[in-house]
A protein has these predicted regions:
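Active-site cofactor/cluster-binding pocket
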Residues: 1-202
């Protein structure tokens, strides 16, 4: 994929690793020589609060803000949040969505009604939606914290640089934690990439 500027919107719930994933994506873009701008634009990053970040990179980027209808990819760590931000995608762009539900406190407080079928609603709106259960993949690998690496694997083939560049940034991020942690993240990345490839609509 090649864009003058690549616009990625990442959304989810605090504690899922949304900000860490955005940081790693930005590190990969910088490693490839791109000008990078990113910002957290909504919610609070503490566990349970909604988190949304905008990431833009290219030859020269003036603003970190993504305008509605201009995102090239949406990386949704939580299905209802992905639905809520789907209007930011440009026509024909892809949403990669973890379909495991994590209901935020605003729902429990009655401030927001959780949609019955957020993935189905996205598809009915014509959004090119690729969904998979990142939480189960991470759990099967032995650690739910691997979920953000699973999500990074899922987006790897939608970036204007190779998956190996992104994986290298993940390895560098976790290298200080030891080879076992690095290897678990390698497996999570590969599993997420495979899950997304298998779920891409024809």
């Amino acid at each position: 994929m090649t864009f003058e500027t690549t616009n990625i919107l990442v959304c989810g719930i605090g504690g899922q690793g949304v900000m860490t994933a955005t940081e790693i994506l930005s590190e990969a873009a910088i490693a490839e020589g791109h000008d990078v701008k990113k910002t957290e634009v909504a919610g609070m990053s503490q566990r349970g609060g909604v988190v949304t970040s905008h990431l833009r990179f290219g030859r020269k980027v003036l603003s970190p803000q993504i305008a509605p209808g201009t995102a090239d990819v949406l990386l949704g760590f939580e299905a209802a949040e992905a639905l809520r931000w789907a209007h930011y995608l440009k026509p024909g762009a892809m949403a990669l969505v973890n379909d495991a539900r994590l209901v935020p406190p605003v729902v429990e407080l009655g401030l927001f009604k959780y949609p019955d079928d957020p993935i189905g609603e996205m598809k009915s709106r014509g959004v090119r939606t690729v969904s998979f259960d990142a939480a189960t993949i991470a759990r099967d690998l032995g650690d739910l914290r691997l979920g953000n690496t699973v999500m990074l694997g899922a987006i790897a083939d939608q970036l204007p640089f190779s998956a190996e560049v992104l994986l290298d940034c993940i390895v560098k991020r976790f290298a200080r934690k030891g080879e076992q942690v690095v290897e678990m993240n390698r497996k999570a990345f590969a599993a997420g990439r495979e899950a997304a490839q298998a779920a891409v609509p024809a």
